[in-house]
Amino acid sequence: MTRKTIIVGVSGASCSGKSTLCQLLHAIFEGSSLVHEDDFYKTDAEIPVKNGIADWDCQESLNLDAFLENLHYIRDHGVLPTHLRNRENKNVAPEALIEYADIIKEFKAPAIPTLEQHLVFVDGFMMYVNEDLINAFDIRLMLVTDFDTLKRRREARTGYITLEGFWQDPPHYFENYVWPGYVHGHSHLFVNGDVTGKLLDKRIQLSPSSKMSVRDNVQWAINSILNALQ
């Protein structure tokens, strides 16, 4: 019997912890799949340039049409397309799985029930920016944002591997590009456009606090998923 596929979005601003959370959920829920929106970045030459600087943190830096097509493929076929299966674990940071091995052990079956559904976890920073994308997910999780924490985490990163090279943020990149890009893509989801405030869109579940530990985020996400599947 073919299991029903449930697509679970895990979104949030850059450095909100969404990728770590997605990796841990993938490790906890046996038989699940993992998709990274980052795999849909455009080539380096296609990244929009604003004020002479490449803007990797705007919607236009991603091929969202291809991303949506792949989500529809997963919905229709119940499996990841070959090119995503081949990349499924390439963006996984093994150090995170080692660092949080105790959390995986705590929540892994039999601590949680074995599900009849095939869960596909999708992590990305621009996943709820329009209705077509929002509707592509069955469960929509979002990590709450905190400007100062995100800025500190982003500026602590050494850089990013791109399709064709390596990118390192220039000074003041977070406040001039990363944060404005996130606000532009998500303000429509929040009361008065305040992305640090309350959600207007009840289809999306927002984590209770930006101060939650990794374990608390995992607990919240698992509870949200299991409740949605009831």
UniProtKB/Swiss-Prot annotation:
Known EC number(s)? 2.7.1.22, 2.7.1.173
Query: Looking at the record's lineage, which domain of life comes first?
Result: Eukaryota
Give the residue range of the signal peptide: none
Q: Which CDD domains match?
A: NRK1 (cd02024)
Q: Which UniProt keywords apply?
A: ATP-binding, Kinase, Magnesium, Metal-binding, Nucleotide-binding, Pyridine nucleotide biosynthesis, Transferase
Please tell me which top-level EC class this enzyme sits in. transferase
- UniProt binding sites for Mg(2+): 19, 38
Q: Which of this chain's residues are annotated to bind substrate?
A: 38-41, 56-57, 154, 159-160
Q: Please indicate if the UniProt record lists tRNA processing as a keyword.
A: no
| Annotated coiled-coil segments of the chain | none
Annotated metabolic or biological route of this protein: Cofactor biosynthesis; NAD(+) biosynthesis
Biological-process GO terms, alphabetical: NAD biosynthetic process; nicotinamide riboside metabolic process
- A cellular component term (GO) from this record? cytoplasm
Catalytic residues?
38 (proton acceptor)
Catalyses which reaction(s): beta-nicotinamide D-riboside + ATP = beta-nicotinamide D-ribonucleotide + ADP + H(+); beta-D-ribosylnicotinate + ATP = nicotinate beta-D-ribonucleotide + ADP + H(+)
Alphabetized SUPFAM superfamilies for the sequence: P-loop containing nucleoside triphosphate hydrolases (SSF52540)
MF term (GO), any: nicotinate riboside kinase activity
Q: Which residues bind ATP?
A: 12-20, 153, 157-159, 203-205
Report the protein's function.
Catalyzes the phosphorylation of nicotinamide riboside (NR) and nicotinic acid riboside (NaR) to form nicotinamide mononucleotide (NMN) and nicotinic acid mononucleotide (NaMN).
Instruction: Give the family per the record.
Output: Belongs to the uridine kinase family. NRK subfamily.
This chain belongs to the protein called Nicotinamide riboside kinase
Q: Which source organism does the UniProt entry give?
A: Schizosaccharomyces pombe (strain 972 / ATCC 24843) (Fission yeast)
Lineage start: Eukaryota, Fungi, Dikarya, Ascomycota, Taphrinomycotina
Which gene name belongs to this protein? nrk1
